């Protein structure tokens, strides 16, 4: 099976200074844009079918950049007008893939206070008496279930 493909890649990055940060960090977000075309030829059937032309764009974050809702996202546009399948349906023109951290920020850029809050809640849920305490506070209608879970951890000395 022979395969022929061409790829054109362009990338861009810009340096931004964040005046809100006290230590004057430089943020380096970067994005890449690539155009992929290709042609596949099968040796068993002497027909050639061109694979879809994709315009692919991805947003990458660096360790010094600010958290952005676009970091970890990947977008691809299908530029070909070919049909696929037996019933002749058109392929989708836009494909968006998002990483886990970009969707709900499970691991990145969480404050010390929010980490301490979850730690206090999980510590209460570990024991029988802690679970009973949370159950009583829920029955009472409390919004803050664990008020004593490191309240000053958001402030750094």
Curated annotation (Swiss-Prot):
| A GO term for molecular function | rRNA binding
Q: Transit peptide: which residues?
A: 1-97
Give compartment(s). Plastid, Chloroplast
Tell me the keywords, alphabetical order. Chloroplast, Plastid, Ribonucleoprotein, Ribosomal protein, RNA-binding, rRNA-binding, Transit peptide
Q: Which GO terms describe its cellular component?
A: chloroplast; ribonucleoprotein complex; ribosome
InterPro entries attached to this UniProt entry: Ribosomal_bL34
Biological process GO annotation list?
Answer: translation
The UniProt function text for this chain reads: This protein binds directly to 23S ribosomal RNA.
**Family membership:** Belongs to the bacterial ribosomal protein bL34 family.
Q: How does it associate, per the subunit comment?
A: Part of the 50S ribosomal subunit.
Q: What is this protein called?
A: Large ribosomal subunit protein bL34c
- The gene it comes from is RPL34
